[in-house]
Design a protein with these regions (language model features):
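N-terminal extracellular ligand-recognition/capping segment immediately after the signal peptide
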Residues: 13-27, 32-59, 66-77
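Predominantly extracellular beta-rich ligand-binding scaffolds that present long acidic/polar faces
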Residues: 196, 207-321
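Extracellular beta-strand solenoid repeats
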Residues: 39-41, 47, 60-62, 73, ...
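Non-catalytic propeptide/linker segments at domain boundaries
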Residues: 1-9
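Short glycine/acidic-rich loop motifs that flank beta-strands on beta-rich extracellular proteins
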Residues: 48-51, 75-77, 97-105, 136-144, ...
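Right-handed parallel beta-helix
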Residues: 85-96, 117-137, 149-167, 172-199, ...
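C-terminal accessory segments
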Residues: 308-350
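Extracellular beta-strand-rich solenoid/capping regions of secreted or surface-exposed proteins
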Residues: 45-60, 71-122
């Protein structure tokens, strides 16, 4: 497949500790206005021995090979990747198992981006694309309790194996946790996220309850889950918590072709819609979702009353091959027929 890549700014030699590298090679001021792409070598092994804070500089850490990822291992218990602006991780295998801090944490904001509603507004995306992340003991993304409004947070074509730990506070918050602010658009697509830790998050996504599109100068917000597989997250909690979105005409939702198993206390779509009926919003798209919890379904006759009302919820077991060990290959006929969940688990017969 042909893929276009932004020009390389620097190639970082394999075997490098990225903490040392960025101490010795500070991101230049060019990064204030231009995305700078740092390439890790295909198949190369890298470490990060302490947190790296990119602040207000736009950085992509990536492997240019989509088939031979560089491997990045966090090597201390308090390592986070920090940013306060547009940022991306692409085509990386990340081992976060030694760190008990959030994988991505937002920096002290640059005062110059303070805007409508006193939000620190980042006009661009925080992106995780094409990554395989293991050993996430704490939040995947945390806003550092700063009043950020990111235009978008995008997770695509990524596997994130959470090992949520009782040594952190994650049981009281979320996998994607904006304590001070919110993401105006959250899009999770073509991805698999699951938890096998000794703890669990209370929510998959949580924003500060004041967060709302119009309060930060946007016309509408979006929460989009598209072709994803989710397993064993917020099992006794709630999938989503963002009081400022609830029942607002400016809140848009798109939830299509996902498989949720043992998530969100059998109320996934209800919580995505903030406990308000689909009819209370201008834009709610739902189709071909599976909501299975302890072998039962949220839906009856293809409908979750008031919430997923298109009429085509799937009520067959997706038949994961070995969920406990991270193999979510599906065997469920309805899921195969409608090509649902993360596409990587739809295996065609040889």
């Amino acid at each position: 497949a042909f893929s276009t890549f932004t020009a390389t700014y620097q190639v970082i030699p394999e075997g490098t500790d990225l903490a040392t590298y960025f101490e010795e090679n500070a991101v230049p001021d060019e990064g204030l206005t231009t995305m700078l792409c740092y390439d890790l070598q295909p198949g190369g092994e890298y470490t990060m021995s302490k947190s790296v804070d990119f602040g207000n500089k736009q950085v992509t850490l990536r492997t240019t090979s989509i088939s031979n990822h560089a491997k990045l291992k966090l090597t201390a218990d308090n390592v986070s990747i920090k940013t306060g602006t547009i940022f991306a991780l692409k085509n990386l295998d990340i081992d976060a198992s030694q760190s008990f801090d959030p994988l991505i944490s937002l920096s002290t904001p640059d005062e110059s981006i303070k805007g409508t509603g006193d939000y620190y507004i980042v006009r661009g995306a925080l992106t995780i694309n094409g990554c395989n992340i293991t050993g996430v003991n704490n939040n995947l993304i945390y806003d550092g309790n700063k009043k950020y409004c990111y235009e978008s947070v995008v997770i695509n074509n990524t596997m994130a194996h959470l090992t949520l730990s009782s040594q952190t506070n994650v049981s009281g918050n979320a996998v994607i946790y904006f304590k001070g602010g919110f993401a105006n658009t959250l899009q999770v697509s073509n991805s698999t996220i699951w938890n096998t830790g000794d703890s669990d998050s209370k929510y998959f996504v949580q924003y500060n309850n004041s967060g709302r599109a119009t309060r930060a100068g946007y016309n509408n917000s979006n929460v989009n889950f598209l072709n994803c597989t989710f397993y064993n997250i917020a099992k006794t909690g709630q999938w989503a918590n963002y009081g400022g979105f609830n029942g607002q005409k400016c809140s848009y939702f798109d939830v299509e072709r996902n498989i949720f198993v043992d998530c969100g206390n059998k109320q996934v779509i209800r919580r995505i819609l903030g406990g308000r009926s689909a009819s209370s919003y201008d834009v709610v798209k739902t189709q071909f979702n599976t909501y299975m919890f302890d072998g039962e379904f949220e839906s009856t006759g293809g409908i979750v009353e008031n919430y997923d009302v298109t009429g085509n919820c799937l009520e067959t077991d997706p038949g994961f091959k070995d969920a406990k060990n991270g193999d979510f290959t599906i065997s469920g006929s309805a899921q195969l027929e409608n090509k649902t969940g993360d596409p990587r688990w739809i295996k065609t017969a040889e």
